[in-house]
Amino acid sequence: MSFDFIKDRDKKVHFIGIGGISMSGLAAVLLNSGYKVSGSDFKESEILKKLRLSGADIYIGHSEKNIKDVDLVVYTAAIPENNPELIYAKENNIELMNRAEFLGSIMKGHKYNVAISGAHGKTTCTSMLSNITLKANLDPTILVGGELDIIGGNFRIGSSDYFITEACEYKRSFLSFFPYVGVILNIDADHLDYYKDIDEITETFGQFADLIPNDGYLIGYVGDSRVKEILFKAKCNTLSYGFENADVTARNITFNEKGCASFDVYKHNDKLFDLTLSNPGEHNILNALSSICVSLIFDVNYDDIICGLSECKGAHKRFEYKGEVNGVTVIDDYAHHPVEIKATLNTSKKIPHNKTFCVFQPHTYTRTKTLFDEFTDAFFDADEVVLMDIYAAREKDTGLVSSNDLGVALRAKGVKCTNVHSHDEALEYLKNSAKPNDLLLTVGAGDVVIVGEKYLNQGK
């Protein structure tokens, strides 16, 4: 399949699942470049409303009628084979491209492509780098897996050769990209509905690194042994970061009352500058270092790096302050992997409060089943866990695992855990349990945020 972003502007492109965070960004890039765009999704959303206003033809529901006048159909890995639009496109020889291939074809039109990969932190790192490059007037095109206030959403159209995007390993999607700078934040066991094990995942990240040209750069975190090994084997230029034994390091770290870090940035033994982040948590020091490494490659001046990071508020759903009611602070976070949950709860410890209520909604049956033991060890920093039913997303319930099973295992390890089966049930429990100066975290990649929003709106 082929698509030339510059030459194919007379084509009409249809997106199956256009309401997704990545697909909507790609659709917006085309709309802003003069393309005719259509798309379908299963329910209405604010994203779809924005795309309509930009000129896209939007359909709610999937039907072959939606694609009878299109030249190219773009679909995601989450679209099932029995989707009627996908079937019609195949039967009628309409050109098809998956999302990753399509994004790769757009990247071809840029020289300085930055692809940010890793099991955790991609959106935050992309947000930080976006802030820096905008401060430095590099005028980048940006595709981010979350809503970022500084660009007014999940995409930005630039007019320069700089292109910044997240690079997801699910179904080897990022192997369709053309990175000049590749970032590997970390490697972890995830997407085990597709990968056999962590070794296969690591091998795929190695293949991603091999995509970088010899004059390009691979940036990686040396505290992750698998990333360190890929850095060692890389054929391109490399730049490592970490707390020690790396090219770029953070030293003399302290935290303020909001949980945000201040530290000195060193390259080898030379101090470059000192910095205070506006994103809380120790893990965000590493995210900042990765974005600093990219900035150094592009010769961004230190003042722009400092300003970009100190003013970066991050993307929505990344330890996002939602509000306060009756003295209870509500924060929402996208964490859905045990490592991410631990980082989120560790961050919450740095904020003065009494009890931490963690409302967690597991995301997919496969992840809950394959990482079950890891999930049972992820919540020790929460005073109470309110455990919702599993959010199925792209899967069907096989009956092999449930939130009740996870609740039993957590209670067996001494975690105070209450199972609930709806947003309203979670809300009622919290209304009766949370007290002034408590912290309420809604955690997960599904729709658990609704619980926090309803809690904030109680009595209105």
From Swiss-Prot:
Keyword Protease in annotation: no
This protein's UniProt keywords: ATP-binding, Cell cycle, Cell division, Cell shape, Cell wall biogenesis/degradation, Cytoplasm, Ligase, Nucleotide-binding, Peptidoglycan synthesis
Protein residues bound to ATP: 118-124
InterPro entries in the record: Mur-like_cat_sf (IPR036565), Mur_ligase_C (IPR004101), Mur_ligase_C_dom_sf (IPR036615), Mur_ligase_cen (IPR013221), Mur_ligase_N (IPR000713), MurCDEF_pg_biosynth (IPR050061), UDP-N-AcMur_Ala_ligase_MurC (IPR005758)
Pathway: Cell wall biogenesis; peptidoglycan biosynthesis
EC class of the enzyme, as a word: ligase
Keyword NAD: no
GO molecular function: ATP binding; UDP-N-acetylmuramate-L-alanine ligase activity
Catalytic function, reaction form: UDP-N-acetyl-alpha-D-muramate + L-alanine + ATP = UDP-N-acetyl-alpha-D-muramoyl-L-alanine + ADP + phosphate + H(+)
Annotated localization: Cytoplasm
A Gene Ontology cellular-component term: cytoplasm
Gene3D superfamilies: Mur ligase, C-terminal domain, Mur-like, catalytic domain, NAD(P)-binding Rossmann-like Domain
HAMAP family: MurC
Family the UniProt entry places it in: Belongs to the MurCDEF family.
Function: Cell wall formation.
Protein name: UDP-N-acetylmuramate--L-alanine ligase
Originating organism: Clostridium botulinum (strain Eklund 17B / Type B)
